[in-house]
Regions:
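Loop/turn-rich, solvent-exposed surfaces of beta-rich toroidal or solenoidal domains
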Residues: 168-169, 173, 184, 188-221
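Short, solvent-exposed loop/turn segments at conserved positions within beta-propeller repeat blades
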Residues: 27-28, 70-71, 116-126, 165-168, ...
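Beta-rich, blade/repeat-based domains predominating
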Residues: 5-21, 48-69, 92-109, 115-116, ...
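Blade-level signature of beta-propeller repeat domains, shared across WD40, Kelch, NHL, RCC1
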Residues: 239-283
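A short helix->beta-strand "capping" segment at the edge of beta-propeller domains
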Residues: 1-8, 37, 184, 273-276, ...
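A short loop-to-beta-strand structural motif that recurs across blades of beta-propeller domains
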Residues: 31-33, 74-76, 127-130, 169-171, ...
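Short loop/turn segments immediately following beta-strands, especially the blade-tip
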Residues: 173-180, 275-280
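A short beta-strand motif characteristic of beta-propeller blades
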Residues: 1-5, 40-47, 84-91, 137-143, ...
Length: 283
């Protein structure tokens, strides 16, 4: 296992880019950065915010970057000149607490909402998933989720998997041609696992980061654990990338509790190791 980069304030939302770099959000400094396999780091997007902010992102099939502006309840789209425009207004579907995003191969963007601000100690409320179609219209397509977190879409575009952190499970939905979700079911009951960011591989297995248990876990549909990577720090998200997508990247840092999310200094890092199967699907 190697450290690809260090000095991250609060890393999240890793994505393997078309430019052969690992992109990730650093919530603590309100930016999206990219790092190549030699560890060369570049700040790609700086968001105009004066305080700690949740940032998640993904790309449309044509390469345009979408960024979730959680506080404003908007899905932003970055233009060729780096300017940001509103791609969709998300607040018609739920109150601001927007979290993760995944875009499938058809250009359907799924954005989930925790429905409460756990960092402020708000009382739990069930969350939801909104669908943003390629034309920028948004509507709710799933509800009643126990802290929806990382999401992934299988390579056939037929299944969306969502981590329910508070329910300790991965939940799956069928995806219709128009992006609607149906046939909700438990994809994997994780026992004591607490899933955060997730990704899927070409053998049909899923990886999930686990913050309180300080590990990254590969699991099969049905819940069988295939591999556990024990870590010294909490794993907030994971991504399969590299030239053949056979490298597992893990975003890790010390977890100080929800009330101290902005107080972690620069102790975050991204670790990498070989994976048993290449990445597949989205992200």
């Amino acid at each position: 296992m190697e450290a690809l980069t260090t000095g991250i304030a609060f890393g999240e939302s890793p994505r393997w880019g078309r430019d052969a770099r690992l992109w990730f959000a650093d919530w603590g400094v309100r930016e999206i950065a990219a790092v190549d396999l030699e560890g060369r780091l570049e700040s790609v997007v700086e968001l105009p915010s004066a305080s700690f902010q949740a940032i998640c992102f993904d790309w449309l099939p044509d390469g345009r970057l979408l960024i979730v502006s959680s506080r404003e309840g908007r899905l932003l789209r970055m233009g060729p000149d780096g300017s940001l425009a509103t791609h969709a207004d998300l607040n018609g579907g739920a109150e601001p607490a927007w979290n993760e995003i995944v875009v499938d191969g058809r250009g359907h963007a799924y954005v989930n909402n925790t429905a409460f601000d756990f960092a402020s100690g708000d009382e739990f409320a069930p969350g939801a998933i909104a669908l943003v179609t390629p034309d920028g219209s948004a509507r709710e397509v799933a509800e009643g989720l126990a802290f929806p977190n990382g999401m992934a879409v299988t390579p056939d575009n037929r299944t969306l998997i969502c981590a329910e952190s508070y329910a300790r499970r991965l939940t799956a939905f069928d995806i219709a041609e128009d992006g609607e979700l149906s046939s909700r079911r438990v994809w994997a009951d994780l026992g004591d696992g607490v899933p955060d960011g997730i990704c899927v591989d070409a053998e049909g297995a899923g990886w999930y980061g686990d913050v309180p248990n300080r590990r990254c876990v590969r699991v099969r549909e049905g819940g069988e654990v295939l591999q556990t990577v024990e870590l010294e720090l909490g794993c907030f998200a994971c991504m399969l990338g590299g030239p053949d997508r056979r490298t597992l990247f893990m975003v890790v840092q010390e977890w100080l509790g929800p009330e101290r999310m902005a107080d972690g200094g620069r102790g975050g890092r991204i670790l990498s190791m070989p994976a048993p199967a290449p990445g597949a699907g989205w992200p």
